[in-house]
Amino acid sequence: TSEAVKSFAHDERVVLIQPTRNDLGIGGCWDVAIRSAQCGRYAVQLDSDDLYSSPQTLQRIVDAFHQQHAAMVIGSYRMVNFDLETLPPGLIAHAEWTASNGRNNALRINGLGAPRAFRTDVLRKIGFPNTSYGEDYALGLAFSRHYRIARIFDELYLCRRWDGNSDAALSIEKQNKNNLYKD
């Protein structure tokens, strides 16, 4: 990832933050980034093998923060292969998560959706857990206790799947371990 970011080094809007510690999981790396003075008003997820589905994705997220008066925004994504061909089940919108079901409806689903975006001022108060699985789910639950989580049910993100994905073709033992962490 750092090599890809370095290819954009000429663009002053791009900032590469490299943790100096070597004991950090994904959440720990996020935490270093959001505590940097260079981190802006919002922090938005983009996994290294995934893509935003349009040039308007980030603007739509910022608009949702304002229109829905939220501290966190979660979009919807489409499963694709590396040729960007849709894979089953296609669009993952978590349409069962609605305002009428309550803000803690996240407890009833096995994932929050993507991309996930956070208001940085709130995120710095909560902090990312230093783990490499479920760090975003833990934050979603923490945010939902006190803040509104906005939803965008249209596709914003392309989630590319391949055999080496951290959550591809998991054994039942690994699924149970992951679900225990979420519990």
Per-segment meaning from a language model:
Residues 1-18:
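Acidic donor-binding segment of Leloir-type glycosyltransferases
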Residues 20-38:
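Glycine-rich, basic loop-to-helix element that forms the pyrophosphate-binding segment
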Residues 39-40, 111-126:
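Conserved nucleotide-sugar donor-binding
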Residues 40-51:
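Short beta-strand-to-loop acidic/aromatic patch adjacent to the donor-nucleotide binding site
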Residues 56-89:
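Conserved donor NDP-sugar-binding/catalytic core segment of glycosyltransferases
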Residues 76, 150-156:
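Catalytic beta-strand/loop signature of glycosyltransferases that borders the donor
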Residues 96-117:
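A recurrent flexible, glycine/aromatic-enriched loop bordering the glycosyltransferase active site
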Residues 132-139:
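Acidic donor-binding loop at a coil-to-helix junction in glycosyltransferase catalytic cores
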